[in-house]
Amino acid sequence: MAKDSPSPLGASPKKPGCSSPAAAVLENQRRELEKLRAELEAERAGWRAERRRFAARERQLREEAERERRQLADRLRSKWEAQRSRELRQLQEEMQREREAEIRQLLRWKEAEQRQLQQLLHRERDGVVRQARELQRQLAEELVNRGHCSRPGASEVSAAQCRCRLQEVLAQLRWQTDGEQAARIRYLQAALEVERQLFLKYILAHFRGHPALSGSPDPQAVHSLEEPLPQTSSGSCHAPKPACQLGSLDSLSAEVGVRSRSLGLVSSACSSSPDGLLSTHASSLDCFAPACSRSLDSTRSLPKASKSEERPSSPDTSTPGSRRLSPPPSPLPPPPPPSAHRKLSNPRGGEGSESQPCEVLTPSPPGLGHHELIKLNWLLAKALWVLARRCYTLQEENKQLRRAGCPYQADEKVKRLKVKRAELTGLARRLADRARELQETNLRAVSAPIPGESCAGLELCQVFARQRARDLSEQASAPLAKDKQIEELRQECHLLQARVASGPCSDLHTGRGGPCTQWLNVRDLDRLQRESQREVLRLQRQLMLQQGNGGAWPEAGGQSATCEEVRRQMLALERELDQRRRECQELGTQAAPARRRGEEAETQLQAALLKNAWLAEENGRLQAKTDWVRKVEAENSEVRGHLGRACQERDASGLIAEQLLQQAARGQDRQQQLQRDPQKALCDLHPSWKEIQALQCRPGHPPEQPWETSQMPESQVKGSRRPKFHARPEDYAVSQPNRDIQEKREASLEESPVALGESASVPQVSETVPASQPLSKKTSSQSNSSSEGSMWATVPSSPTLDRDTASEVDDLEPDSVSLALEMGGSAAPAAPKLKIFMAQYNYNPFEGPNDHPEGELPLTAGDYIYIFGDMDEDGFYEGELDDGRRGLVPSNFVEQIPDSYIPGCLPAKSPDLGPSQLPAGQDEALEEDSLLSGKAQGMVDRGLCQMVRVGSKTEVATEILDTKTEACQLGLLQSMGKQGLSRPLLGTKGVLRMAPMQLHLQNVTATSANITWVYSSHRHPHVVYLDDREHALTPAGVSCYTFQGLCPGTHYRVRVEVRLPWDLLQVYWGTMSSTVTFDTLLAGPPYPPLEVLVERHASPGVLVVSWLPVTIDSAGSSNGVQVTGYAVYADGLKVCEVADATAGSTVLEFSQLQVPLTWQKVSVRTMSLCGESLDSVPAQIPEDFFMCHRWPETPPFSYTCGDPSTYRVTFPVCPQKLSLAPPSAKASPHNPGSCGEPQAKFLEAFFEEPPRRQSPVSNLGSEGECPSSGAGSQAQELAEAWEGCRKDLLFQKSPQNHRPPSVSDQPGEKENCYQHMGTSKSPAPGFIHLRTECGPRKEPCQEKAALERVLRQKQDAQGFTPPQLGASQQYASDFHNVLKEEQEALCLDLRGTERREERREPEPHSRQGQALGVKRGCQLHEPSSALCPAPSAKVIKMPRGGPQQLGTGANTPARVFVALSDYNPLVMSANLKAAEEELVFQKRQLLRVWGSQDTHDFYLSECNRQVGNIPGRLVAEMEVGTEQTDRRWRSPAQGHLPSVAHLEDFQGLTIPQGSSLVLQGNSKRLPLWTPKIMIAALDYDPGDGQMGGQGKGRLALRAGDVVMVYGPMDDQGFYYGELGGHRGLVPAHLLDHMSLHGH
């Protein structure tokens, strides 16, 4: 059997070959087991590393949690301790306050009781003193009167001895009593001071919590208590010597009073003893010692600490006994000897006894016998015995009295004092107990609260402690929960470690210190489990293979044993793996809750941190809010300070204003004095009156010129001092001339060959007006009246000189004034004739027969009137009242005053008629001053300081005005001043106005503005202030300034002040500055592009539109808005857009333009987010562009005898791209070359501004005077002028301002123009074709024949036609007059429906001589063409499609009309049957119209979604190219149509070039008005009570307001104007003209 046993290597020794495979298998298995063991070891090492990592993490978390818990606990503990300390400190302070209050209350009680006891003692003492004095008096009387010395038989020696003896006895008693009383008082004071100090020490020791006061009571007081009392025996005091002089008994009574008061103190001190043995006060002299001894014994038995002792009395007590008790002084000195006392006088002797000598007290002379001495001795002994008995009796009575009066009260006082002392003692004890309890409470609160304590402070501490504990528990709940979770995790880890350590592999680690305490990772366990399962499967496969191989080979028993052993090992390994798998699963299940708990703890921790962060943020926000509140409070305080300073400044300004008012009052008084002085000097002027008349008659100067020279300054001076007017019909009397008189004068002027109208520029005046034309009497009076009529409402316009009077133009003529001045040298011109009239009757012009009484003056009998000139043809004078009013005066109501009576008849209120009587030198200075002021004022009024326009001729004219006219005016003013004329006539009131006038702002944009003014002197610079800050200084001669960098939409205040040199500031110049306010525009719209050019493209049918883009800033903005692109418009219609802010060109195709057209204009607008800009300067499309497309060419004058046709008049216009070359160069080649000069003349007339308010008569002589060589330069100047006008019109931002310049109303120019137009063969590119739709007409032949007959008659009657005008021109002029008469006849039937508009319709030949260049009735055609009268409503516009496009059907394109007035057919229709087919519309409503007018002058229209007929006379057509945006009709060329403007007040709509000119339904020739800017001269309140119901629709004015006026003045003297966004009627006589344009 031993041989068969297997070898250790698994092979048989006999059969090594057979055992080798089994050995190899075993070796493989062994290697695999070792490999498995190595893997297990590696896994265990990984597990141990994971355990260490988790342990470190757990330790770190535990440490962090512990650290946080400690920090939180420390923070909470510190907060709790701080709060507890604050509470304790508050409790201590409260208890301290209570204790101090109780002590103060106790002291007050004690002081009150002391005061009461002291008062009582004072009263008792006073009673005792009185009793003692009475007893002493009685004793002295009894001793003196009843003694032996008073007997008749007694000798003088015995009497003297008796008195001496008596005095000795009294002095001895007094000394004994005083010494005893002083000792007692000192003792009682020392005892009281000791008790007081002890009481204070006790209070400080027990109630303030401080140690007791160190030291002992006052040593003097203690010593005074310990020293023995002085002896009370009589032997201790030496008797006084008899040789001393004796005092009177009065001093004795005083000493007794002092002793009694001291005794009162002793009794009060003794009454405080606890036993109360002392019941009475000493009532006699011999009872002092026993009472004081008893008091001393009772005082010695008192305790040293007593709370019921008396405090020292107040220091203000005046009595000696009530003074404050101080430490005991040194013992009292011995009393003075008895000789110091005075004798008490008896009642009978009175005061006389005091003066008795003291001989009675001297010893008797030594001459008596022995018996007599014995007898005397016996008598003295007997008297002494009687006196002793009497003293004893008195002593007993005193005792009885004291015992009867005081004992009960003293006992009661003692009892009360004892009770109070007991109460004070108990209160002190309670206070000490309370302090001790507080100390114990503090100690318990610091250490630990003791339960069961009933003290209030302890309860509060407990409540606070519980609250803090609750807060701490709530705040620490999170850390505690986290600690619990960490502890649970730790326990679970311990359990897991124990389970791992108890496994089968624990024996491998026994040598390393016991079981492992590491953490197992669940993932690692899962991975290990899967790997173990794979190993088991692999081993099972190997075993199966081994079993299969073992069946093939027959093995021995050793092989089966080896297999069994391996099988057993495998099973053991499988069991171990299953056990490990179960453990891993258990660990995984336990680790999941632990992980969840850890995550929850982390979540709670994060929540706590977030809460802490939120609290910190809240705290920061509250802190910031607190800081902000503090800052606001600081700002408020600062604002209050500023407000206070502003109030102070306001008060100072008020004081300064009062001072200035006082100065002004003084200046006014001085001025009144100066006005009174010249009146006194009138008597000195009479001798020189004839010399003045001689000067007036001197030839060489027309008499009207000086008057007119000073007339305009006077109007301005009066305009500044007129009172406030209210709108009544009577108030307009000062502004309107007589209408009938003016019509007659105008009619006469129409037939006069003299040209009164002046052209728009100064060179034309100097060249065209003949120098030798005389002025007739009627002409001079007419010019005076016309200028007088417009004086109140207007002043000459500075830039254009449009409204200069005829006399002012004569001043500019070199032949009339300047040449005369040059030839005459310094000779003064003749002065006008001044006459003074007196009113004989009362006269009210409104009650007279005249139709227009506004221009006449109301007269009162006795009034003085200053008359200028001669009487006119109607019997009226031009006069002025003494209050400054001017007007017409009827000659039959006044009577002239002879010259001899003038110095004595002038009223006190009349103007100054002579110089003031001043000392030598001052009168000359005053006269020179007035002449200077009048000269400067005249220069301003005559337009001498106007802004110079471009052109050499204008500069020459200005130089002429500056150099020559000043000399003329100076001489005139000197002459008038010497004559004694009034200062209003001289144009000044004695104070020169140096301030610049007529401040005007123009070109106001969002960021800039231009201001112009008329300076009073061109020799001084001006300072420009913006918002009361100096902005710029303009040099002398400059009257404009441009502001840059302004803020959009901001209100500014501009002030212009003249800066005078130092030497001129010494004179009072009056106002030196003028102020105007304005608002800058809001940002936008952008500026339009520049230099628009239209050119043909290389491709046919294509145009290239190029422009210069607007200037934009870095942000791409123009005028404050963002630029987005450009829009191209052709005749007001948008054709394309370019979405590029920097684009400069685009391409237009032929299909984009409106066809057919003879020509078009292209404009470009800048697009932005806020809308589009205004139109740029339009560019004309090349003419050959349309020719290449074969446009149907229409002759310029066409007529068709069929249906109502369209008449078109071609006249030249000035496009903005017009070059400086003569207009003839632009004309078509079909025009003859001779047309250049007439076209230049026509352009000159076309560019002209609206005519002046002077005369409706045209200047016929101005035509043809200019040579043809100057046509080009004139056209150039006019083109520049029109360019400036265009800019100014664009600046006004009003749709009514965008209008072409009206054609001049000069008939010669119009006829000349029409003549040349008739000769043209084709339309020129610079002409506009206008058409007028006409109604029913006469036959051409009949009309022509009738007109020719009328024209021949008029041609024969008129002989003033200039020879240079041709026959056709005369024919056209006469034809114009005939047309006007026929139109007046045709308009008669239309006035029935316009009667409520009649008040606003101007009369023919109105004072404003403005007219349209295109006649309202009908346009002229060729001489052979038929003439048609025009209907009431006309449309002058450019045809869009030619005549062939106009139709009468509904398919015709709709046109837009605007209603000129309200219309209700049921009320206003002439045909009530057809009223149902008519439409109702309102004024300013837009209507859509199809076709043309029918035979009844009606249109087919749509209004309010209803279709019907509308009367053509009440509507006017707008341009075709309108489009509706935002539910409003909008015109592309001018923006939105006016929604507020009253169109009937405009006398026609003004529309830009290329669009239709809309006129009103009036057949007469009405002017096309340009809005004017005027300034209010006075205040005006239409809502005044005097107005009644007439003030509705009128504007309220303030002096200096700038008003935009539309249209002419109506019959009632009103303009239609706009102020501050409101529109209404404005009285014309309260407005003055302002300069609208300036360069």
UniProtKB/Swiss-Prot annotation:
Residues 776-790 have a biased composition (Low complexity). Residues 1392-1406 have a biased composition (Basic and acidic residues). Residues 707-718, 761-775, 1293-1305 have a biased composition (Polar residues). Residues 326-339 have a biased composition (Pro residues). CDD domains: FN3, SH3_RIM-BP, SH3_RIM-BP_1, UDM1_RNF168_RNF169-like. Residues 1-22, 215-240, 295-364, 697-811, 1251-1273, 1292-1325, 1392-1413 are annotated as: Disordered. Pfam families: SH3_2. Residues 832-899, 1452-1520, 1569-1636 form the SH3 domain. The keyword Ligase does not apply. One of its GO terms (cellular component) is cytoplasm. Residues 21-143, 409-442, 480-619 form a coiled coil. It comes from the Eukaryota. Residues 995-1083, 1088-1184 form the Fibronectin type-III domain. Probable component of the manchette, a microtubule-based structure which plays a key role in sperm head morphogenesis during late stages of sperm development. Interacts with LRGUK (via guanylate kinase-like domain). Interacts (via C-terminus) with HOOK1 (via coiled-coil region). Belongs to the RIMBP family. This is RIMS-binding protein 3B.
